[in-house]
């Protein structure tokens, strides 16, 4: 069976941890997109010689970078940019990993909202990416205490 390839869209420490895990697990990562403040991702990507784009993926340069990689899977975690349809639509499996039990706390910093609202637990959701913000069909959810993040 032919292993599907992945382009990772990630930011911050959580994104760096996911990238390390995916690479260490032997998945075929073709490229990484991140932002300029995600130095752990930038350093790791350069160390293992993966192509990297730093900046807005919706820019002409970002779109051109993505087109260089014919990957089936888009994997997004803690990514600071909302990716437009012309980008995520070019992947067979555009997947996001989100730090709440969707549909609760869509968008950025969901764990902060869980704390503000005195939630006893939260969780993580993987879902397909669509035009809405964290509104795609849910693939998997896992509950955990709010402090697990």
For each feature predicted by the language model, list its residue ranges.
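One-carbon transfer enzymes
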Residues: 1-149
């Amino acid at each position: 069976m032919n292993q599907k390839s992945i382009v990772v869209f990630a930011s911050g420490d959580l994104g760096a941890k996911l990238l390390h895990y995916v690479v260490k697990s032997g998945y075929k990562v073709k490229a990484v997109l991140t932002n300029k403040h995600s130095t752990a991702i930038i350093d790791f990507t350069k160390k293992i010689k993966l192509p990297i784009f730093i900046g807005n993926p919706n820019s002409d340069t970002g779109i051109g970078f993505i087109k260089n990689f014919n990957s089936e899977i888009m994997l997004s975690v803690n990514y600071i940019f909302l990716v437009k349809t012309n980008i995520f639509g070019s992947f067979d499996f555009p997947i996001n990993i989100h730090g709440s039990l969707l549909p609760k706390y869509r968008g950025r910093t969901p764990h902060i909202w869980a704390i503000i609202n005195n939630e006893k637990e939260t969780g993580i959701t993987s879902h397909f990416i669509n035009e809405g913000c964290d509104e795609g069909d849910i693939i998997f959810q896992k509950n955990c205490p709010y402090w697990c993040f």
